[in-house]
Amino acid sequence: MGTIALLRLDTMILDIARHKFYEGIITLLITTIVMIILLATSAGDSGIASAPDSPLMSLISSATFGSGFVEGLITVILYIVSTLTLSRSTLRTHIYTADTMAPIALCSVMLLPMITTGDALHQAVVVLLLAHAMANMFYCFSHRKCFHRLFAAMVAASTLAVVDASLTIVPVTMALALIAARKKLREAVAVVVGMLLPLFAYCYIAWLQDVSFSESLLLWWRSLVAPLSLNILDNLKLTRLIFIAFIVFLQATSVILHLSHREIHSSVMRGSWRTMQLMFVASLCCALLLPSASDSLLTVVVMIASAMLSMYFINSSAMLSVVSYVALASLAFAAAI
């Protein structure tokens, strides 16, 4: 399994390198170094409120790997793989061109303040699952035969709801968007089965441990509706609050920019953007209104926004792109400290 994982990572790096994304790789490496330093210096510092005991939350949070160094290393590896996965899919589906450097560079810096918040390993798992869900979702709009992509996207998205019940809105909105886009019964069945499979697997594993299916579902439902002791906004540092508010503002303006040039965009980009807009708005509303909203919801909001902010770099000049990116990166680093 380790060899397969390394080969997959090498394939992603080489695929991005063929598109002349060296700047993005360098950015990712620099951001990773900063992330390692932040994880080492802020161990145990919970930036915002912790999430409730959802099905797999306690397992991930209590996981021990012998030392904090190993846990930090695993977190960094998940962070790198997630960024490369999302960036590679935007290139191969032609959502963004190879000249835009933005997908890999933006994802790496925009996620930095969220990964280094609270339980870093849990946040890295959420980012990894969402990256695979979004990557497979992009392929669903670019290929006629995408049965396996539909299934893989929904399995990854639905696993988010098992990891953290407050993220249930992600698979629900993605499923509705994919069913509406594909409009075929066979593919709708694949979406529904993929969405239910992770929850069934969790209930089955709990059943093997003498916990009934109904009790497992009841635990998941309580995790979804049970309020946190602290609202995520009440315990949010000012720098991260400013960062998230600014990202939400930029995402809203990027939608206007996308709609103003909609006729020149491909059908793949239009379909992907509609789905990301739906997921972004739904996740943001849940983060503000859902009693059980955890910090993972804010991570989802920032990650979806980072994939959409690349719109700013498509037609902008090189100088403006550099200045804008440096400003965004500076804000992200300041929010992560």
Each model region followed by its residue ranges:
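Juxtamembrane membrane-water interface segments that cap and precede transmembrane helices
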Residues: 51-66, 217-241, 255-258
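Transmembrane-helix signature of polytopic, membrane-embedded enzymes
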Residues: 90-110
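Membrane-interface alpha helices of multi-pass inner-membrane proteins
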Residues: 149-163
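Membrane-water interface signatures at transmembrane helix termini and the short loops
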Residues: 258-317
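Aromatic- and kink-enriched transmembrane "portal" helix at the membrane-lumen/periplasm boundary
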Residues: 105-124
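Perimembrane helix-loop-helix junctions
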Residues: 170-196
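Transmembrane-helix motifs of polytopic, lipid-linked glycan transferases
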Residues: 77-93
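Membrane-interface transmembrane helices that cradle and orient dolichyl/undecaprenyl
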Residues: 133-148
